[in-house]
Amino acid sequence: MTDAKNVLVTELTGFANPMIARRLAAAGARVIGCDPSISEDGAHDGVEVVGWAKPADVVDRAASQFGGKLDAIIISSAMPAPRIRVEDLTEENLMPYFERLAAGSLLFAGAAVRTMRPNKSGRIVFGSSSGPIGGIPGFSAYASSRAAINGVVRTLALEVAGDGISVNAVAANFIQTETYYPRALLEDPVKGPKLLARVPMGRLGEAEEVAALVELLALGQSGFVSGQVIPISGAWC
């Protein structure tokens, strides 16, 4: 259980984020979400939301609704990752990954730090990928943007450690969500078995399992854990 912690969850409708928001709320946190598809303040599927804007504006408005104290932020951007050979990369099909998954995530982190520093406490949890760790041929655009976040976790953790802020990343892969591994793929009689054969545990992970790890890092007794990129991929990496 939590002591009424205030948590902002970005990109509320993507990947495992709906489950993350529900689990944090069930643990006693006050959760506010934001998403590119939501332009107005209000509510979405029972979760309080602020309309999408620049990261600094979103964080400031959420913090204001929290009464000035942001305890944790879950920065979990997600976008489809089609297979693109490296020789076919162009600025047009490469840069959107960096703008959304890397630059956008880091800007949210910076805005959160500005809010958390005066309180000398806070937790930043990035939603990232273990793809850059294990390596998947044909996904260099996606992997490079995720690797940027994985690579900055340690640096950012050292930068804010003295202010009582922890920084970690949940590096997921082989999680059954409609964003990356939709149920239709799993149920395909040819592609499904091939997919599961790549996972040492022989199954896909569930959004609830990602949410459980996020809860531990955002709300649990894990405040001394920082600077870590934690794979959740069924022993794939």
Feature map (PLM): residue ranges:
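Catalytic Tyr-X3-Lys loop
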Residues: 87-107, 121, 125, 149, ...
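Catalytic loop of short-chain dehydrogenase/reductase
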Residues: 79, 97, 123-148, 153-162, ...
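A short, exposed helix-loop element centered on a Lys and neighboring polar residues
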Residues: 109-110, 154
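Short C-terminal tail/terminal secondary-structure segment
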Residues: 215, 226-237
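Short, small/polar-rich loop/turn modules that mediate ligand/substrate recognition or access, typified
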Residues: 161, 166, 225-227
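Canonical Rossmann dinucleotide-binding motif of NAD(H)/NADP(H)-dependent dehydrogenases/reductases
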Residues: 2-32
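Conserved mid-core segment of classical short-chain dehydrogenase/reductases
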Residues: 50-53, 78-95, 138-141, 181, ...
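A glycine/serine/threonine-rich, flexible loop-to-helix segment
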Residues: 162, 174-198
